[in-house]
């Protein structure tokens, strides 16, 4: 049995989070309640020297009090292999800085259990991983070829155009067949993004909400429905979407059954998927949100279920 004592959280700085809706805070608060020592560091404090992985960390104490939610000790440099668990929880963009951190953390995983598995996080970008389940998705095009995008829009009518590696609803546009700004939109994307873009058929069901379903070790444990603002195509809570309680439909349960084995095979202990109507649009493996909202609406204590799964995983390890 590999008992957990020390837990490091690689995250955006704790001073900047909104504790009312932050899943990293919920995960960390549950770890603290279980008696683990918490260590906080931001991605830029991660380093490798002579083959060993270090970070400049602060021991962290949390309080569920707005405006007074954390205390940090003096910084110290530690060998991250001395940690039992590390949570990879900084927000995207999924850029080379993010990818580099997965390469470094891969050096100490799984002896130090990194959640989620850093190699598979690197190899499973949210908007690309989901295409492995093409029959569960809306019609989708990934390209930077503007003629292909124009052809796709002519076939689909209304489309959604978004950056391939964005997050939080940033850069998401709804373009109708007769949109006179379409050429300008493609020009803007060409100036802003070096990578291909993703275009998807517009799903009118988004007006009823975009469902975020949370899975722990491949099993659904909670969900919220995110309803977009009246004049916005985006339902992300970062973009003004309104969360509301919900239950899983038979179709959504089927989607979870289909993807569960792939999540477990890749070591994804905590995942959030997005579903509009009958279609899955993303599999979020970097820093899924929604834990506090699920709990607020009377759903499961997802943070507790996640730590149960982590403890089970550690117990199965034999070092």
Curated annotation (Swiss-Prot):
GO CC terms in record: cytoplasm
Positions with a binding annotation for ATP: 153-209
Cystine pairings recorded for this chain: none
Keywords: ATP-binding, Glutathione biosynthesis, Ligase, Magnesium, Manganese, Metal-binding, Nucleotide-binding
EC number(s) recorded for this UniProt protein: 6.3.2.3
Top-level division of the source organism's lineage: Bacteria
Pfam family, one: GSH-S_ATP
Cofactor annotation: Mg(2+); Mn(2+)
EC class: ligase
Coiled-coil blocks: none
Pathway where it operates: Sulfur metabolism; glutathione biosynthesis; glutathione from L-cysteine and L-glutamate: step 2/2
InterPro entries associated with the record: ATP-grasp, ATP_grasp_subdomain_1, Glut_synth_pro, GSHS_ATP-bd, GSHS_N, PreATP-grasp_dom_sf
The ATP-grasp domain, residue ranges: 127-311
Gene Ontology molecular function: any one: glutathione synthase activity
Known catalytic reactions: gamma-L-glutamyl-L-cysteine + glycine + ATP = glutathione + ADP + phosphate + H(+)
Annotated cofactor note: Binds 1 Mg(2+) or Mn(2+) ion per subunit.
Binding locations of Mg(2+): 282, 284
Stated family: Belongs to the prokaryotic GSH synthase family.
Protein name per Swiss-Prot or TrEMBL: Glutathione synthetase
